[in-house]
């Protein structure tokens, strides 16, 4: 910030430390958003599992299924939730870096430095990473539902959920 100014607006001097911190904070934001999303999926899947498996005997249902699901998520499955969110955050971060590079190269084209093959290749990479991100999101959400039911770790749950999806292709 500029010292000695009496304005409501301040300027920031972007040195390398500030740039690295901004990248670090952005990655943390991606990780936290994915973690909260997967925590929500897990809690809803636990509540549905409580209801489904105690349908015949309502006395077996917990009084507060959301609180119990949150407790199970924190106590038993926090690492699995964090690992899946980290995996998704890394993929999203790579996608945003590629999108930044595409934008930078297109700005260079406006200045007269043309490289259409590079832009095409980078856009193909962004498309590939976006498709991979959607696949990981889908398999992870099904894996977290399986995790809520079976209680296994993240990788095992995703593998079993994927096997279940592949063995029943008409259902999804």
Model-predicted segments: where are they?
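Hydrophobic alpha-helical membrane segments
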Residues: 1-172
